[in-house]
């Protein structure tokens, strides 16, 4: 199908089915079952086999009449992409539809207190007991785990294999005994993350993705998508009678989905506020400050163009290259530079919070939020290693952990052995 054929068909379907008086889940069930909720997915799994670049036409038509799309935001899509790539038929049938309708929320259960950057060093245990896997251990930095119905769990199922080969990937029910979720308070005042404890939690044998030991390769699929730019949840455009119940339900969903990310603009350094703040304080008259602002805006615009090229390549169906690592490195560098420029402009006032502080405390929040950019989602050092080894072809770092994982030196707990 070409662009105009897609536009005509989806427009005709929406004219016959869109009704703002429907319940949100009821509407999304119609949309999902029609294939228009995820048109670039396989037709066997709630899609229409459209080329990725044609899915934007569907988005445009939904927005034109104010129709709400499928639930595409956040970790839901990490789960969907991973299931599409590695799930069996039964898993896809059971879990993909409730992702698109918004009935199920998901979280990612990868990082651990003792293995953040070294993800393959995970020590959360998965022991097979009949038709169930018994899970014991701890995860951390889990966005939205306190709202999640299911988790994407990476756990160690074989201690006699090297660390990358002894991992398995599970779908874990978060609403069961043995799963405890605790929110973490950050130094910027937000609580975007959680720590999750497992005490004899259970996963049915049918809920392993791939085979035992395939966890590392499957996790790479999840992480490759995570490092790309997510499509943000779209507010209905055009004809949007906010009094209709469906829009109120959608707004409530957005508030829950976006709550962990409210501080993300500050994490990125708030480049958009630098010039305004320089004018307010008179620092714009300082030639050094002006030069720093110019450099900052040049870097930020270059990063935006790089991200646009990466998104265009993704929509054209090209494989993921080094753009994810390059973009993440650029973002953390820009955030640090913006934080320094804000400090130079506002001086001691940059440290103050409250209504009388610089931009009502936003600048202070920038200073305590930007360090996260160089850590979350893979540290700057990891991104540099990826670029060095996979793009530049430089020698890999020497490794001393290629034997059985139980023999690898580490800070172990009594349950590790």
What are these regions (language model features)?
Residues 179-300, 373, 411-417:
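Glycine-rich beta->alpha junctions and the first turn(s) of the following alpha-helix
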Residues 279, 283-290, 301-357:
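C-terminal helix-coil-helix/basic helical segment that borders enzyme active sites and/or dimer interfaces
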Residues 102-110, 154:
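A short, Trp-centered hydrophobic/proline-enriched beta-strand micro-motif
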Residues 124-127:
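A structural signal for short hydrophobic beta-strand segments in well-ordered beta-sheet cores
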Residues 53, 57-58, 78, 216-221, ...:
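Glycine-rich phosphate/cofactor-binding loops in nucleotide/flavin-utilizing enzymes
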Residues 131, 136-182, 194, 218:
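A short core secondary-structure module
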Residues 1-74, 93-98, 261, 280, ...:
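Amphipathic, small/basic residue-rich leader segments at the start of a protein or domain
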Residues 33-102, 144-150, 300, 307, ...:
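Internal helix-loop-helix
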């Amino acid at each position: 199908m070409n662009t105009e054929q897609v536009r005509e068909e989806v427009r005709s379907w929406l004219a016959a089915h869109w009704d703002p008086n429907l319940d949100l889940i009821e509407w999304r069930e119609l949309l999902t079952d029609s294939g228009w909720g995820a048109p670039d997915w396989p037709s066997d799994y709630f899609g229409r086999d459209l080329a990725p670049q044609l899915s934007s036409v569907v988005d445009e038509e939904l927005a034109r009449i104010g129709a709400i799309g499928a639930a595409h935001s956040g970790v839901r899509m990490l789960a969907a992409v991973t299931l599409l790539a590695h799930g069996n038929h039964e898993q896809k049938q059971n879990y993909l539809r409730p992702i698109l309708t918004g009935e199920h929320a998901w979280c990612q259960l990868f990082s651990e207190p003792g293995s953040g950057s070294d993800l393959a060093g995970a020590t959360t245990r998965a022991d097979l007991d009949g038709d169930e896997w018994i899970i014991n251990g701890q995860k951390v930095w889990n966005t939205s785990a306190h709202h999640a119905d299911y988790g994407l769990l990476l756990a160690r199922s074989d201690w006699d294999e090297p660390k990358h080969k002894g991992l398995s990937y599970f779908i874990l029910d978060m609403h069961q005994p043995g799963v405890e979720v605790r929110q973490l308070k950050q130094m910027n005042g937000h609580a975007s993350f959680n720590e999750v404890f497992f005490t004899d939690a259970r996963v049915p044998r049918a809920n392993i993705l791939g085979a035992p030991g395939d966890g590392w390769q499957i996790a790479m699929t999840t992480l490759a998508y995570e490092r790309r730019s997510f499509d943000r949840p779209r507010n209905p455009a055009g004809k949007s009678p906010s009094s209709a119940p469906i829009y109120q339900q959608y707004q409530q969903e957005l508030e829950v989905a976006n709550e962990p990310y409210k501080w993300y603009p500050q994490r990125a350094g708030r480049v958009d506020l630098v010039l305004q703040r320089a004018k307010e304080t008179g620092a714009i008259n300082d030639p050094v400050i002006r030069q720093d602002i110019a450099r900052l805006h040049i870097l930020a615009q270059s990063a935006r163009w790089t991200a646009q090229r990466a998104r265009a390549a993704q929509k054209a169906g090209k494989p993921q290259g080094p753009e994810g690592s390059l973009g993440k490195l650029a973002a953390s560098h820009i955030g640090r530079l913006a934080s320094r420029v804000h400090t130079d402009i506002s001086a001691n006032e940059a440290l103050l919070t409250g209504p009388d502080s610089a931009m009502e405390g936003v600048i202070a929040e920038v200073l305590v939020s930007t360090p996260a950019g160089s850590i979350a989602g893979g540290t700057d050092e990891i991104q540099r290693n990826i670029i060095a080894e996979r793009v530049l072809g430089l020698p890999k770092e020497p490794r001393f952990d290629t034997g059985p994982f139980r023999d690898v030196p580490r800070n172990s707990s009594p349950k590790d052995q």
